[in-house]
Amino acid sequence: MSALNDKSVDNGRIARRFAALKAEGRAGLVTFITAGDPDLETCRAVLHGLPAAGADLIELGLPFSDPMADGPAIQAASLRALHAGTTARKTLDLVRGFRETDADTPVILMGYYNPIHAYGVDRFLADAIEAGVDGLIVVDLPPEEDEELCIPALKAGVNFIRLATPTTDDKRLPAVLQNTSGFVYYVSIAGITGAASADNAAVGAAVERLKRHTDLPVAVGFGIKTPEQAAEVARVADAAVVGSAIVTRLAGGLDADGKARPGLAEDVLGFVRELAGGVRGAAF
């Protein structure tokens, strides 16, 4: 773990949540939604309902017009959110509103560097902390560019969560992990989000390999679509991450004009409850 990890990172909501999960003897469920998808009101309803539905940590996508690492489902969600007028500032407003009723559930912003750079790194970090953001996943900033955002984030007390993939070999892994904090996000399939699910034995072996290099929790995502798949991952990892399947469920509740049908938020939260049931029913 990096010397940059100060107390505000090490003892923050993410660390406390994983410690609580470990004490309960179970893995966590990490849910992803895109901020402002399909509109701010519906997104707000889903966001506020996620903890009660069983989400242990929340990833909130920062909409961007060119989400190159994402598959069609999350690309479409990002475009819907942008069309609805969602900005980085409004994304932080969503987190701020969430914190009025939930002081404990970790919120991680996930996205690309461009909107953060346009906002201004120092101002973004200050506003993110004030809003109640716990961590960042910025998929297009490799370790070689840590000075851009990763190191300022850690110094400010914001976790910087890095992705590891099946192609991250033992030579590359120390660089990936050096300034990572909060948890490691293992992408179980090399490619875009929402692709086919990975072989669980391979995922288990990959988690074991990561654990040899870091004491941080390991969350596994990409390709988890069902409660059964979430349960399989929960047996070998510290958390299962579900994103595209939730976003796809949300998209299925839109009318021909792309507007939310009545009951959409409740339907999405019902699906999250099913996923949480899978995760919580899995034994280590």
Swiss-Prot record:
Catalytic activity: (1S,2R)-1-C-(indol-3-yl)glycerol 3-phosphate + L-serine = D-glyceraldehyde 3-phosphate + L-tryptophan + H2O
Example of a GO MF term: tryptophan synthase activity
Catalytic residues of the enzyme: E59, D70
Record's keyword annotation contains Isomerase: no
InterPro entries per the UniProt record, alphabetical: Aldolase_TIM, RibuloseP-bd_barrel, Trp_synthase_alpha_AS, Trp_synthase_suA
Top EC class of this enzyme: lyase
Entry-linked HAMAP family: Trp_synth_alpha
Family affiliation: Belongs to the TrpA family.
Assembly and binders: Tetramer of two alpha and two beta chains.
Name used for this protein in its record: Tryptophan synthase alpha chain
Native organism: Azospirillum brasilense
